[in-house]
Amino acid sequence: MSRVAKAPVVVPAGVDVKINGQVITIKGKNGELTRTLNDAVEVKHADNALTFGPRDGYVDGWAQAGTARALLNSMVIGVTEGFTKKLQLVGVGYRAAVKGNVVNLSLGFSHPVDHQLPAGITAECPTQTEIVLKGADKQVIGQVAADLRAYRRPEPYKGKGVRYADEVVRTKEAKKK
């Protein structure tokens, strides 16, 4: 039995929740998010809270209910507060710039790298070596950050590359003669 699913998700004032079968839509000041839940999960909205439980006849109902609770909690946080992900560029000549919804990266290649941001995600560069991604959808923010990092992952000898702000890069010792 899932302990996560037993805790209800509190719906704050200003957040609108619509349940249409297994499709849940949550609307708030930062936008609107929609998700289709597994058939094994039953969601109830009462007293400004969402409660979760398994449907009858499903073996993995509690496990799926815990997953659904975590996903919907992230959606509620996203439409109220939003999510932020910070990236750092480490290396000589590595720099970033944002023009509209395109992130322009200079990462030591013979050409600049332009990355198109999906709808609902904004980026800003406080400095030339920092990128701050903001948005309501936690999964999309994480995917965009992973895509930007994949252009030049931190290498293990000098630590050069694109890294998350809280990432610790373990460096190896150079080969000795």
Swiss-Prot record:
Disulfide bonds: none annotated. GO terms for molecular function: rRNA binding; structural constituent of ribosome. Keywords: Ribonucleoprotein, Ribosomal protein, RNA-binding, rRNA-binding. GO terms for biological process: cytoplasmic translation. Gene3D superfamilies: Ribosomal protein L6, alpha-beta domain (3.90.930.12). Transmembrane segments: none annotated. InterPro entries: Ribosomal_uL6-like, Ribosomal_uL6-like_a/b-dom_sf, Ribosomal_uL6_a/b-dom, Ribosomal_uL6_bac-type, Ribosomal_uL6_CS. One of its GO terms (cellular component) is cytosolic large ribosomal subunit. Belongs to the universal ribosomal protein uL6 family. HAMAP family: Ribosomal_uL6_B. This is Large ribosomal subunit protein uL6. It comes from Citrobacter koseri (strain ATCC BAA-895 / CDC 4225-83 / SGSC4696).
